[in-house]
């Protein structure tokens, strides 16, 4: 077993499956290491397995450590905002944002029971962030650290292209923040996630959203029926 000390944290690299499971059960940040000698060994239950650990850089190891410790990844920063993965501590702020008049006119509401929203955030971390590496993230005011919205990229069931979504607190609207954050997210999607086509859905009467999408380079593609409601689908082609 190797103790890897990087960026102020440590990870344990272990090529013994039973020992790795014991360490993980003790809440130690352990990563299983596959070798030619143990390739047929059962490593089931180990959250992370790697080959050629010397080829993995410190930043990737740090992100593995964050996953094991259930800590959020920092995604990106803009001039005024920070975007990171959502935590359960953000939920109260979401309810404050969503209770403002007009916020849920074009945005799916939160659960009626905050406990359900907390559980959703936990499940989202485990089943979306950990699996895909992207999703809807939390937007913070970089100057104050205050949660001011949500934005990100998701994969809607039945569609091939990722979808841009966002909601910004009412008191922060009209300042260009949505455009600033969404532009950075689109660049992240292209450079870090390899996306070349991104879609967005908006109601025809939602003129501010339509204006923003066009400003970001989206063009109208088609009308789409989502559930029982009609939406305009816009596409951004970054090929």
Map each language-model feature to its residues:
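GNAT-family acyltransferases
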Residues: 6-9, 48-171, 188, 192, ...
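Acidic, Mg2+-coordinating phosphoryl-transfer loop and its flanking beta/alpha structural elements
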Residues: 12-45
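Aromatic/hydrophobic pocket-lining residues that form the small-molecule binding cavity
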Residues: 16, 118, 182
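Conserved active-site alpha-helix within GNAT-family acetyltransferase domains
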Residues: 146, 205-222
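Conserved acetyl-CoA-binding loop-helix of GNAT-fold acetyltransferases
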Residues: 166-168, 174-191, 207-215
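Conserved beta-strand-loop-alpha-helix junction that forms the acyl-donor binding cleft
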Residues: 200-210, 227-229
